[in-house]
């Protein structure tokens, strides 16, 4: 199994809206995403983890998602809430 971890800096004062946006999209797509915000740790950072059985499954999920009109609408809102940068990691679970 693999974990796709996406870490992003959220604009100050926008975390609640960002969490709501991401959780709604996870629910809409019935994906296995988990949203993390720090109780202690870096300020204004959101981490989202998705699990995949393979790199092929990862590519299929994201290629199909980005091809939808809902993804375009989501990303339009996303860019109003997030700072430039972030990370997109793919981890093997031992």
Predicted segment positions?
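Short S/T/G/P-rich N-terminal loop/turn motif that feeds into the first structured element of a domain
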Residues: 1-94
């Amino acid at each position: 199994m693999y974990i796709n971890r996406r870490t992003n800096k959220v604009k100050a004062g926008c975390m609640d809206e960002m969490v709501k946006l991401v959780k709604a999209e996870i629910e809409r797509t019935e994906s296995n995403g988990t949203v993390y915000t720090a109780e202690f740790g870096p300020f204004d950072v959101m981490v989202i983890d998705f699990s995949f059985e393979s790199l092929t499954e990862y590519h299929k999920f994201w290629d199909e998602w980005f091809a939808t009109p809902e993804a375009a609408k989501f990303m339009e809102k996303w860019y109003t809430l997030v700072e430039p940068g972030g990370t997109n990691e793919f981890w093997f679970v031992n």
